[in-house]
């Protein structure tokens, strides 16, 4: 279906090497055959409680992204997401703290914050055009997913350097009294 849409909307005949999908809990409720090569849940918060009877119901919907046998990319800072880890499953973690050997996280060196893979610094946080811990966490998740897919590091870092964020997100509206 996506190939047809690409052909009709964008006049693209070649099949893409991969698809990047952002799926809501609503969409995941009706997803039965997804077997993503890599998937992540960035965090869990009590959203959409008008739709779900309990937080556990919401978590169960989000957990559906991990059906299949692909790499799980999980937020080590969120205990609910960490509880989704399946024994024996290939997984990468990301954290705003210092990462373990094969995980992604932040390293503090020389007075600077670095996005890192294990002990290896990949990109300085100051090189990014986005701000906020949530954006650093998202960038770490993206790097972990790209790494799991075997994407070239320089391509991923170039994309992060160029990314300006979404319109109206973390935009200064007014400064008052200082």
Segments from the language model and where they lie:
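Acidic, Mg2+-coordinating active-site environments of NTP-dependent enzymes
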Residues: 3-16, 36-37, 41-178
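Carbohydrate-associated surface elements
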Residues: 28
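Acidic, glycine-rich active-site loops and adjacent beta-strand->loop/helix elements
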Residues: 1-2, 25
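Switch II (G3) loop of P-loop NTPases
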Residues: 17-25
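ATP-dependent NMP and nucleoside kinases share a basic, alpha-helical "lid"
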Residues: 31-35
């Amino acid at each position: 279906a996506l190939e047809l849409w690409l052909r009709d909307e964008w006049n693209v005949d070649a099949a893409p090497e991969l698809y990047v999908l952002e799926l809501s809990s609503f969409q995941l409720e009706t997803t039965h055959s997804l077997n993503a090569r890599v998937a992540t849940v960035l965090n869990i918060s009590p959203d959409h409680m008008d739709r779900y009877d309990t937080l556990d119901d919401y978590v169960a919907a989000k957990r559906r992204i991990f059906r299949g046998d692909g790499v799980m990319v999980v937020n080590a800072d969120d205990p609910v997401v960490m509880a989704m880890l399946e024994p024996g499953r290939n997984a990468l973690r990301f954290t705003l703290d210092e990462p373990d050997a094969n995980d992604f996280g932040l390293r503090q060196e020389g007075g600077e914050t670095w996005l890192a893979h294990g002990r290896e610094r990949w990109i300085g946080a100051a090189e990014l055009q986005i701000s906020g811990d949530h954006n650093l966490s998202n960038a770490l998740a993206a790097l972990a997913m790209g790494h799991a897919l075997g994407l070239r590091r320089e391509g991923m870092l170039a994309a992060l350097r160029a990314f300006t964020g979404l319109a109206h997100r973390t935009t200064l509206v007014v400064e008052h009294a200082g």
